[in-house]
């Protein structure tokens, strides 16, 4: 994350610190400003909602994971293995805020309207995770991969919230979900290949 003088970082850290203690639903922006030792008008220059604070935190996690992945040697691995490694790096990056994230996740499950605006930032994060693993996230195929990975991540994240330090359950869930996702995408690819072949044959006979 950025340096100590970064007001956004102070606000994000304050929000997570308070969320770990008192949950997310009842947490006011004024409380966050007070904990961050910034005025409410100063906070408003950076964030106009708690959702925006979480989205900014997510972007910082994205950047941290992208840097960590760049420092790793992933190019020789299979695509699924690269994705596994990248997502585990993401869990490592999230670990310091695990207590806060557990409270936030529990509150957002009970408040779908509050959770809804986070869907788009999450898809963007998953797009970056694919790119970090050397997998294209553009076009129709990329959009399918992004949405599929979001489902994989959501399932593994739920397990991670209650997992121990060894993260064995998280790794098992992540591996299982990635294999399922790979099989699904391979099935789509085979189906599309058959459609193209049939179309080409019909066109040749016309």
Where in this protein do the model-derived segments appear?
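Short, basic, alpha-helical segments at the C-terminal edge of helix-turn-helix-like DNA-binding modules
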Residues: 59-66, 73
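C-terminal peripheral helix-coil segments that are non-catalytic and often amphipathic
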Residues: 131, 162-206
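Amphipathic alpha-helical packing segments from all-alpha helical-bundle domains
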Residues: 112-135, 143-157, 182
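Short amphipathic alpha-helical elements of helix-turn-helix/winged-helix folds
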Residues: 14-18, 93
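Hydrophobic alpha-helical connector segments
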Residues: 56, 70-103, 110, 120-121
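Amphipathic alpha-helical interaction segments
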Residues: 10, 31, 85, 89, ...
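Short, hydrophobic secondary-structure boundary micro-motifs
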Residues: 102-104, 117, 138
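Helix-turn-helix
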Residues: 4, 10, 18-56, 60
């Amino acid at each position: 994350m950025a340096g100590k003088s970064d007001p956004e970082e102070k606000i994000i850290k304050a929000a997570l610190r308070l969320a770990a203690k008192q949950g997310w639903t009842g947490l006011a922006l004024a409380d966050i400003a007070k904990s961050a030792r910034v005025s409410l008008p100063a906070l408003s220059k950076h964030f106009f909602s708690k959702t925006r604070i979480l989205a900014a935190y997510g972007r910082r996690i994205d950047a941290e994971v992208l840097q960590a992945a760049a420092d790793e040697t992933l190019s020789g691995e299979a695509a699924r293995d690269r994705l596994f490694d990248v997502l585990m790096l993401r869990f490592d990056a999230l670990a310091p805020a695990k207590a806060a994230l557990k409270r936030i996740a529990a509150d957002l499950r009970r408040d779908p309207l509050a959770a809804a605006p986070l869907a788009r930032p999450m898809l963007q994060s998953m797009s970056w995770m694919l790119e970090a693993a050397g997998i294209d996230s553009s076009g129709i195929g990329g959009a399918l991969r992004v949405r599929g990975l979001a489902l994989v991540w959501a399932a593994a994240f739920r397990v991670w919230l209650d997992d121990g330090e060894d993260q064995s359950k998280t790794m098992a869930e992540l591996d299982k979900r990635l294999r399922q996702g790979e099989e699904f995408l391979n099935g789509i690819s085979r189906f599309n290949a058959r459609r193209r072949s049939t179309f080409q044959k019909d066109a040749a006979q016309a």
